[in-house]
A protein has these predicted regions:
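C-terminal interaction module
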Residues: 1-43, 140-239
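Internal, hydrophobic cores of structured domains that mediate oligomerization or house catalytic pockets
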Residues: 28, 35-144
């Protein structure tokens, strides 16, 4: 029997959260994504204790309203149907980066993708120093057929899938030209130019500088700059 977990059946949404004054609003909105996993198990506690109890909405609300100063390095975990889950690790040191991850079954994500992306947009409006990604290039085989990697934050960045590209155009979230799609396979460039590890840079000044920079930059300008620096072969263009 094949025991390998079927990652291709899931979409992972991952968020890096900076704990500012809007953190609670971000968390409340983030947890609204968990309705899609239909949680049945719940845990909130120390990193080394992974015992799950029955899901209790009152307990969840209690956690949301607690004093977070007491809970550095704690985990909030919700487990749902079809191996779906929500995890939040509160940062080891307050005012630094916490990590949240939602794993949603691909069929459920596909059915509710616009609502899910709208919710992610709401999250980013509350916390412009927060960003995250749905790494569909890793988690499902249909990456080039429809899904892309999406980062949520002060600026929306994406390895554009076809429906995602149309969604961003329709919502006017970002000014995108069709030639942005040529960029889809240039992972090294995108990571080096646009993705900055939250673990390396934690200061408020960094987040402020990064946010201001991303508000000014335009995706099409980056694509044009990249095209000037790199000559694509005819084979690359056809592929």
């Amino acid at each position: 029997m094949n025991s390998i977990f079927p990652f291709n059946d899931y979409i992972d949404l991952e968020f890096y959260l900076y704990e500012d004054n809007e953190y609670k609003k971000v968390l409340v909105n983030l947890l609204e994504l968990t309705k899609y996993i239909k949680a049945s198990k719940f845990y909130f506690g120390d990193y080394y204790n992974d015992k799950l109890g029955d899901f209790n909405e009152d307990k969840l609300n209690e956690v949301l309203n607690c004093n977070w100063d007491k809970y550095e390095n704690y985990f909030l975990t919700l487990h749902g149907i079809k191996n779906q889950f929500f995890n939040l690790r509160i940062s080891p040191f307050l005012k630094e980066v916490s990590v949240a991850k939602v794993r949603i079954h691909k069929a459920i994500f596909e059915k509710n993708k616009i609502k899910i992306l709208d919710k992610c947009n709401n999250i980013s409006e509350y916390s412009s120093t927060m960003y995250g990604f749905a790494d569909a290039s890793v988690s499902n085989p249909y990456f080039y057929k429809g899904y892309g990697q999406i980062k949520f934050g002060a600026h929306w960045l994406t390895w554009y899938g076809e429906w995602a590209l149309q969604y961003f155009k329709d919502k006017h979230i970002e000014e995108i030209k069709d030639n942005s799609y040529d960029f889809v396979k240039k992972e090294t460039f995108i990571r080096s130019q646009l993705y900055v590890s939250p673990w390396k840079y934690r200061s408020k000044q960094f987040h402020k500088t990064y946010r201001n920079f991303m508000r000014k930059v335009k995706i099409e300008d980056i694509v044009l700059e990249y095209n000037k620096k790199h000559e694509f072969s005819e084979i690359e263009k056809k592929n």
